[in-house]
Amino acid sequence: MRNDAIKWFVCVVFSGVLLVACGGTKLTTTQVDDARREKPVSDILVIAITYEKELRHSFEDKFVEQLKTAGIEAVSSADVIPISEKQQLEKDAILKAVNEFENDAVIITHMVGVEEKEIITRAPSRGYYGHYLWAYGNTHEPGYSSTRITVRLATNLYDVKTEKLIWSGKSETLRPDSINQIIDDVIKAVIKDLQKNKLLPPK
């Protein structure tokens, strides 16, 4: 898939090919610092790594909203550290922001990769003319092939003072049908696991 088609997540249009329905999001791996388990953070700076300015805002704003709903203070880096597209955040700018807003943790999300796999429906064994009829029908109707898209993201939570990793997780979204679905599902999965490990304060 071309880079301009992927951007941060994935935007795919298939002509005459069935895109399989949404498959949902799950955390495939997680890691927690045992010393920090059940020691919740209180205020998070949210950073999404992407060249696309609108996607950065969208992801971070949704993450901040969900964290606040979960009972924790949070701020979007896009709101407090504005940068141009394709420009990286400088460490000094991040430190200035966490000091100004008194964040005790930083959470960073980036894309690991996008996998696209075409699934071909195999012809049943019906003899040569049965095969012809089956193939003819599927050639003239959608559904002969399908494309499975898998989007993988990684999210890390760091302690501001020590800069040590508190929690990390890798997510996998199978057959996403929109960018918003990926964003919403990943955020929900991450927050749920942080709550399970009592890294977020009780509401």
Which ranges hold each PLM region?
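Surface-exposed short loop/turn segments
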Residues: 88-157, 161
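C-terminal/domain-edge helix-coil "capping" segments
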Residues: 22-42, 51, 140-203
